[in-house]
Amino acid sequence: MVVAIEPFATDGVGRVVERGVAEVFRADGLAAGVPGGDPAVLAAIREFNGLPFARRQLAGLDRGRVEATLRALSAARKLAAYPPLVDADGRRIAQAEHTVYVGSEGVEVLTN
């Protein structure tokens, strides 16, 4: 089992909500392609093997084709979008993450 630990700290109300334009995505089920998706953009997204990726990681590709492909993936329900997390009252949040694998042999830290 893989576990992600993501503590948050804020001087706000302490309730995290999603707000704004998503910059992080996760795509799944792209083996057959997607109508309206650009082949080069889809190939780049496949390289992430279902792991989350940021829009900036596609910066070397044509921006219009990237945006059109992200819209096509979303319409085909093959894209999860992750909007920025903010405190419910708009105050700043500090966030860290640590990922660990818990197996029969023990625990292995996957992040640096």
Where are the regions a protein language model picked out?
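Active-site neighborhoods and metal-handling regions in enzymes and metal-associated proteins
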Residues: 1-112
